[in-house]
């Protein structure tokens, strides 16, 4: 069994995450904890087009949609590289301009 990885944050991702509602933040923390222990939460999925080891937590919460992107193949840590509230009300696809930021 592998030891639990520490979770590190890029500063812009942390600031955006801190603006999420409390319940959404706790759900994301739970999903990141699963990832840090080597698993994948049910609300996480691999991000297409960004290589292996990059995952997205997609969270619908009280009529809004929140996303957190993390990478697991950066040394011994799990890195949260991007967090945002999805503004579009149509479709579930992550907007291209958000992917470009990653």
State each model region's role.
Residues 1-65, 74-77, 84-101:
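Basic, Lys/Arg-enriched alpha-helical interface segments
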């Amino acid at each position: 069994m592998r030891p639990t990885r520490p979770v590190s944050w890029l500063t812009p991702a942390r600031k955006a995450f801190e603006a999420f509602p409390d319940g959404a933040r706790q759900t994301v923390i739970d999903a990141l904890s699963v990832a840090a222990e080597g698993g994948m939460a049910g609300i996480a999925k691999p991000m297409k087009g960004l290589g292996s080891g990059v995952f997205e937590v997609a969270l619908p919460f009280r009529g809004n949609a929140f996303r957190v992107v993390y990478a697991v193949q950066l040394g011994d840590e799990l890195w949260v590289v991007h967090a945002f509230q999805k503004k579009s009300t149509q479709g579930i696809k992550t907007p291209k301009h958000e992917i470009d930021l990653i």
